[in-house]
Amino acid sequence: MSSAIERKSLDPSEEPVDEVLQIPPSLLTCGGCQQNIGDRYFLKAIDQYWHEDCLSCDLCGCRLGEVGRRLYYKLGRKLCRRDYLRLFGQDGLCASCDKRIRAYEMTMRVKDKVYHLECFKCAACQKHFCVGDRYLLINSDIVCEQDIYEWTKINGMI
């Protein structure tokens, strides 16, 4: 389960009453260290408020309040994406090398086939594909546009 993290800001010279909270931000207690939040910036996640440094992954300790980070909350644990997938994601096998693909690894997917990034290359010339490159999927083999005729001829398909 993924949770959104809200970034809040307040001007230290004036302490407005939060429209949702109906209490001044300086009276907020951090969900991590249990201290008052007097910082200009703070976070809201899992129905609690946090200092930026206190909202971290329970396993690896990485900061979860950084831009672009997602917070996963399961079984009472705050987790980064990598640790969430490591604990709860499903591993699979690469269609090219038949070796294990860990749930947190970056992959390429074509139809129902999944490949390690380093395995996603032309079976004939071994060239790695770039965005926009054209290829053909033949069984589990990926063949670049330039090698399709030769590949099918060698493998008795024409």
UniProtKB/Swiss-Prot annotation:
Domain LIM zinc-binding, chain residue ranges per copy: 30-89, 94-153
A Pfam family matched in the record: LIM
Annotated compartments: Nucleus
Record's keyword annotation contains Repeat: yes
Chief location bin: nucleus
Quaternary data: Interacts via its LIM domains with ELF2 and LDB1. Also interacts with basic helix-loop-helix protein TAL1/SCL and can assemble in a complex with LMO2 and TAL1/SCL. Interacts with BEX2 and KDM5A.
Name of the protein described by the UniProt record: Rhombotin-2
Native source species: Homo sapiens
Higher taxonomy: Eukaryota, Metazoa, Chordata, Craniata, Vertebrata
Gene (UniProt): LMO2
